[in-house]
Amino acid sequence: MAPMGIRLSPLGVAVFCLLGLGVLYHLYSGFLAGRFSLFGMGGEPGGGAAGPGAAADGGTVDLREMLAVSVLAAVRGGDEVRRVRESNVLHEKSKGKTREGADDKMTSGDVLSNRKMFYLLKTAFPNVQINTEEHVDATDQEVILWDRKIPEDILKEIATPQEVPAESVTVWIDPLDATQEYTEDLRKYVTTMVCVAVNGKPVLGVIHKPFSEYTAWAMVDGGSNVKARTSYNEKTPRIVVSRSHSGMVKQVALQTFGNQTTIIPAGGAGYKVLALLDVPDKSQEKADLYIHVTYIKKWDICAGNAILKALGGHMTTLSGEEISYTGSDGIEGGLLASVRVDHQALVRKLPDLEKTGHK
């Protein structure tokens, strides 16, 4: 008796072959997709899997998580800043000239801090826009993971999720504020900063002092770990200003507020904002106002603006205009920062200061 077999018609053979090809195509395309995802092809620097709270289409992000990562980024960047300074090998160079004609300095501290801060934030939140002072080398990517834990001090202040669309978020990083002072070993002025703006408005700020390891953070309509002082003198104020143009501000300040006005020359915008607050750092000077009269970059001021705003304070141009943290990376109109005083009255008192800064 002949062995039993299965006969297929030519049509059956064709269907069988098509099914087989379909299975092979599905397996192969899935393999390629996995490989592309693994290597971050088609994504941002530091790509890969979407971070917490970030869907494939952009989705939403929780500002509490962004605050947690921002604090960690500022501290990690600060570790690099401190390590380089203590090694005394800064590899200092100039990126060019500032508008005032001074060298715009950069060191290994700037570069290494920037790398840590950028890739930590980018790995955690790949769908948000990140602006940073230093260039990010796309050929030197690093995946720096976050454990997705929100610290208890943040949860205590901000108990519920604060979701916003990822596409509305812009992050501003200053990996080393006060580079000039850093090269002079004036350590107290140095900070690392992260700011999160939503639709151009500063809502979250972190200022970290690497050499004293003090960190201030705040979220607008959320909470903070820093507070304003109990009183400020707006009649004869102590005014903190840039070391590079203290004389320019002093002349106008004395005319406006009188001879009892004190001018405090200082480095770094982060340090100057902290001078307005109740900071438990013995090296931190105290001021009533912060005035700046020349061009300044947004990564220098965004974190401080968010913190002041969260505490009921103000940071505006010298003419009283709010600062938008979208578009260009700098502002032309000078700067006035205050807390617990009549800010608009101060603006009206300083009508000529902006003109002085643009001679």
Curated annotation (Swiss-Prot):
Region of interest (Disordered), ranges: 86-106
Membrane topology: Single-pass type II membrane protein
InterPro entries: CysQ/Inositol_MonoPase, Inositol_monophosphatase-like, Inositol_monophosphatase_CS
Residues in the Lumenal compartment per record: 34-359
Residues reported to bind Mg(2+) 2: D174, D177, D300
Protein name: Golgi-resident adenosine 3',5'-bisphosphate 3'-phosphatase
Modifications after synthesis and translation: Contains N-linked glycan resistant to endoglycosydase H.
CDD domains according to UniProt: IPPase
Superkingdom of the source species: Eukaryota
Residues spanning the membrane: 13-33
